[in-house]
Amino acid sequence: MRHRVSGRKLNRTTSHLLAMLANMSVSLIQHEQINTTLPKAKELRPFVEKLITVAKKGNLNARRYLISKIKNELAVEKLMTTLAPRYAERHGGYIRILKAGFRYGDMAPMAYIEFVDRNIESKGKEFKALKNDSRNAKLIAEQSN
């Protein structure tokens, strides 16, 4: 019996599902809007909203938890420095899902998943700046050794 079992399997093993959610959440944090199938978007929304709620705490334990979930330190940095302050006054509901018709080929229902109150002009620029800063820091550290 399947009583009170939450979540979707999406025809994947548990490890594959968790890896997919981690990768999709990094893409969503980086670009602040992605296009995917509707069931994946519905599964991704609670995953990312929990990450933002944890990031709003802003302590070391929260940072370590986020790194364990999404395994991308640049995405965690953007969560802690950009997204958490943006949603400091909001209690949940950080993400919206917009239906986008059906995919040509297999008629899969598609959807856009995006952050509420996102800055449309700076799509991915903050993430690229963080990435360049970390690369520059690594280069400086290598040169000093």
UniProtKB/Swiss-Prot annotation:
Task: Quote a single Gene Ontology cellular component term.
Answer: cytosolic large ribosomal subunit
Protein origin, superkingdom: Bacteria
Which InterPro entries does the record associate with it?
Ribosomal_bL17, Ribosomal_bL17_CS, Ribosomal_bL17_sf
GO MF: structural constituent of ribosome
Pfam family, any one:
Ribosomal_L17
Q: Which GO terms describe its biological process?
A: translation
NCBIfam families this protein is in?
L17 (TIGR00059)
UniProt lists the family membership as follows:
Belongs to the bacterial ribosomal protein bL17 family.
Q: What does the record note on quaternary structure?
A: Part of the 50S ribosomal subunit. Contacts protein L32.
What is the name attached to this protein's record?
Answer: Large ribosomal subunit protein bL17
Q: Which organism is it from?
A: Orientia tsutsugamushi (strain Ikeda)
Report the gene name. Answer: rplQ
